[in-house]
Curated annotation (Swiss-Prot):
Keywords: Ribonucleoprotein, Ribosomal protein, RNA-binding, rRNA-binding. Binds 16S rRNA, required for the assembly of 30S particles and may also be responsible for determining the conformation of the 16S rRNA at the A site. InterPro entries: Ribosomal_uS14, Ribosomal_uS14_bac/plastid, Ribosomal_uS14_CS. One of its GO terms (cellular component) is cytoplasm. Part of the 30S ribosomal subunit. Contacts proteins S3 and S10. Transmembrane segments: none annotated. GO terms for molecular function: rRNA binding; structural constituent of ribosome. The keyword RNA-binding applies. This is Small ribosomal subunit protein uS14.
């Protein structure tokens, strides 16, 4: 199991990303707009850099919902490969069975 502090940190990152999502999009549009002046771009870049680091979506880590494991995460199930295999062997995932050819 993952430590509670790490889970809390991930939860904080999710909340911050939602909070600053619209602001980040607006600033990125100003930066990428070819019609905006260089001064507007620089101001937008500085404002973007002043936002909290954890408000960026790329700082979030996908984790297994049961164990909190960060590696070998399968998005389709929201679980790590180990827990998907265990659930599949018990027949808890409909339509999923062991491959044989």
């Amino acid at each position: 199991m993952t430590k509670q502090s790490i889970r809390a940190r991930e939860f904080k990152r999710i909340i911050l990303a939602k909070k600053f999502f619209a602001k980040r999009i607006k600033l990125k549009q100003i930066i990428s707009n070819i019609h905006s002046s260089s001064e507007e771009r620089w101001n937008a870049i500085i404002k973007l850099q002043q936002l909290p680091r954890d408000s960026s979506r790329s700082r979030q880590r996908n984790r297994c919902s049961q164990t909190g494991r960060p590696h070998a995460f399968l998005r389709k199930f929201g679980l790590s490969r180990i827990k998907v295999r265990e659930a599949a062997m018990r027949g808890e995932i409909p339509g999923l069975r062991k491959a044989s050819w």
